[in-house]
Curated annotation (Swiss-Prot):
InterPro entries reported in the protein's UniProt record: ARM-type_fold (IPR016024), CSN8_PSD8_EIF3K (IPR033464), eIF3k (IPR009374), PCI_dom (IPR000717), Transl_init_fac_sub12_N_euk (IPR016020), WH-like_DNA-bd_sf (IPR036388), WH_DNA-bd_sf (IPR036390)
Record family assignment: Belongs to the eIF-3 subunit K family.
Function, as annotated: Component of the eukaryotic translation initiation factor 3 (eIF-3) complex, which is involved in protein synthesis of a specialized repertoire of mRNAs and, together with other initiation factors, stimulates binding of mRNA and methionyl-tRNAi to the 40S ribosome. The eIF-3 complex specifically targets and initiates translation of a subset of mRNAs involved in cell proliferation.
Domain of life from the UniProt record: Eukaryota
Stated name of the protein: Eukaryotic translation initiation factor 3 subunit K
Matches recorded under Gene3D superfamilies: ARM repeat, domain 1, Winged helix-like DNA-binding domain superfamily/Winged helix DNA-binding domain
GO MF entries: ribosome binding; RNA binding; translation initiation factor activity
Principal location class: cytoplasm
Domain PCI per the UniProt entry, residue ranges: 41-221
Taxonomic classification: Eukaryota, Metazoa, Ecdysozoa, Nematoda, Chromadorea
BP GO annotations: formation of cytoplasmic translation initiation complex; positive regulation of apoptotic process; regulation of translational initiation; translational initiation
Keyword field: Cytoplasm, Initiation factor, Protein biosynthesis
Subunit structure: Component of the eukaryotic translation initiation factor 3 (eIF-3) complex.
Organism annotation: Caenorhabditis elegans
Location of the protein in the cell: Cytoplasm
């Protein structure tokens, strides 16, 4: 069954008091799989199944949880990934595969796109630090490979970050932030975000952030009794 059909049926099934009916778990899991296969997303469904796993621990399926976490990473910079983590019981967090997703999430949330693309392309070299999060970096591309559209989602996320942090950016740097994207792909993404090509296309003008700053005046009304109390408290004592 397609994602659209599953989505429609589930939204009817989880409406009102039936939202956390444990009988919905199987259909919710099937819908999550459809999201993975068809590159779709529904926040309500992914958070509902995580809550049902909390309420019905005997139905817990880590494979589905991993899919949910990776899908929420695909909609950064929304807070869905953080919300999803909060709906996983602490006794489940020791899983090595879950930890790998959390570590990947930390890389993306910190906008460390250079590290992300090294991991994806097999160019990452783990450090000797005992706390090195990616001691087996080859597991990362295997983990995200089944997630249709994952790399494209990260590219769009990177462009959204660039839109609010850069005024202009060189095409070469933009290509690196997008994982070595071709000139054609870089130009297409730049156009989709409304960036203007400058200097024979070697630089993109992103936005004049200084020109869009909005000032805000905050007025606070102070009542006279408050002033009187303040003056009384600082008045020096009378000397006789």
């Amino acid at each position: 069954m397609s994602f659209e059909k599953l989505q429609k049926e589930l939204h009817e099934a989880i409406e009102g008091v039936n939202r956390y009916n444990p009988e919905n778990v199987a259909d919710l899991a099937a819908c999550v799989q459809a999201m993975v296969n068809e590159n779709k997303y529904d926040k309500d469904i992914v958070l509902t199944i995580l809550k049902l796993y909390q309420l019905n621990p005997e139905k817990y399926d880590e494979a589905v949880v991993r899919q949910v976490l990776l899908k929420t990473l695909m909609v950064l910079p929304s807070s869905d990934f953080a919300l999803a983590k909060c709906l996983i019981d602490t006794n489940r967090l020791g899983s090595q595969e879950l930890r790998r997703i959390f570590d990947l999430g930390a890389v993306l949330e910190s906008c460390n796109f250079a590290v992300f693309w090294k991991l994806v392309k097999g160019a990452y070299k783990p450090t000797t630090n005992p706390n090195e999060p990616f001691k087996v970096p080859g597991e990362v591309p295997k983990m995200i490979k089944p997630m249709v559209g994952f790399e494209d989602a990260v590219k769009h996320y990177a462009c959204r970050v660039i839109s609010v942090t850069f005024q202009k950016i060189e095409k070469k740097m933009l290509s690196r932030l997008l994982g070595g994207a071709s000139d054609k792909e870089v130009t297409a993404l730049a156009q989709s975000f409304g960036w203007e090509a400058k200097e024979n296309g070697d630089v993109f003008f992103v936005a004049n952030h200084e020109g869009t700053i909005k000032t805000r005046n905050i007025d606070e009304k102070i009542q006279f009794p408050h002033v009187a109390d303040l003056l009384t408290s600082i008045q020096p004592p009378l000397t006789l």
